[in-house]
Amino acid sequence: MKNKLNVSFVLGIRNAERTLRECLNGILMQNYPKEMYEIIIVDGNSTDSTLSIIDEYMNFNKNLILMHNPKKLSEGRGMSKDLGIKAAKGKFVVLLDHDNIILGKDWLNQMLSPFNDKSIMASQSLLDYTKGDSNFIKYVNTLGVEDPFATPYSLVAQVVLHPNKFRIINDYYIHELNPRHVLFGGANGCVFRKEVFEDINGYTRDVDVFASMADLRMKVAVPLNPRVYHKTSSDLFNFMKKKGIYFYRFIKNDYKIKKYNWVERRASDKLRFLLLVLSSLSILPSLITSLNQVFKTGKFFWLLHPFYVFYISLEYIIISLFNIKNFLHYYLR
C-alpha cells in the first residue's frame, strides 16, 4: 500500500503456552513498521505459563498490550475477541488464534494490498503446512478448514477446491458474500476493516461475523500468496476428540445463541443439508474430490479426505442422536 495504515492484531487466548511464542514471533518478524501496529492479547484466565510468556515479550515490545477476560471464553459478545476489537486503535483488525503462525515476512503487506480497493471489507488468508508435518496436518492446512464437513460452506476450502469459480483481480480472489449461501471465513488470519465491526454491531463468532457481512453484501478478498500455518492437533484421534467436544457444546446449548444457522428456514436449505449428510456418509462424492486433487496437485494426503469426512459426519450424527431433542429444535426452527 502507498501509505502504511495502523493495524491491530487481536488474539483471544487461554492456556496458549504450546504455540504462543511461534505466533508472536510470526507477527514481530513482519516487514512492517512496529510503530504502525499493535498486538492486543486478551487472556481468558490462563493457568499455564501463558502470562509469563506474555510478560517476557512485553519487556521488549512496547506495542504489545495485555487485557484480561475473567469469563475465559474467546468468542461471544463481550468475550476476549470482542473486547480486543473494541480496544483496537488500528484501521485494520487482524484476527489470529495462538496456534496460527504467519509464514513469511511480507504476509501483512500482502494481506493489506487488496484494501486499495475501497469495496473490499476483509482479506482472508489461505493456509499451508510446514516441512516434516504429518499427512493429516498437511491435509487440514491445505484444505483450509478444520471441519471437512463444513467444506461446502468454507470460503477458503472452496477457493482451494474450485478456484475457477472465483474472479481474480491482480493477485487475489474476490468474493461478494451472499446471504442465500454464506461462504464463511474470519479465522486463521483474517484482516478486517475496523468499520466492519461497527457496521455489524461488534464481534460474536467468526461464522456469525461473515453471516452479518453477507446480509450487507460485503466483499472479501483471498490473496493468492500469503499463508498462515495452523499448528493444530497432531493426529486424527485428538482432532476428532476436539471436534466432538465442540459439536457437543454446540448442540447442547451454543446453537441457541448463534446468528448463523447451518440449516436455514427455507425448505431448499434443509434439503441441501440432508443431501450433504448423505453424501458425506456415502464417501463417493468426497472420494471423487480427493482423487481430483491428487491428480491436480500430486499430493497423496488428499486421499484422507473421504475417510475424514465420513468419520467426522458419523461422529456428529451419533452426538445428535444422543441429543435428538435439541437437534430437531435446531433443524426444524
Predicted regions and their residues:
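N-proximal low-complexity "stem/linker" segments adjacent to membrane-targeting elements
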Residues: M1-M29
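A conserved acidic beta->alpha catalytic loop
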Residues: D43-S52, D97-I101
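Glycine-rich, basic loop-to-helix element that forms the pyrophosphate-binding segment
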Residues: P70-A88, Q110
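Short aromatic/hydrophobic "clamp" motif used to bind/position activated sugar donors
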Residues: V93
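Conserved donor NDP-sugar-binding/catalytic core segment of glycosyltransferases
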Residues: D106-L155
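Short, flexible, basic/aromatic active-site loop/helix in glycosyltransferases
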Residues: L143-V182
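A short, conserved alpha-helix in the catalytic core of glycosyltransferases
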Residues: F184-G185, G189-C190, V196, N201-P226, ...
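Non-catalytic, C-terminal membrane-associated alpha-helical segments of glycosyltransferases
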Residues: G244-Y248, W262-R333
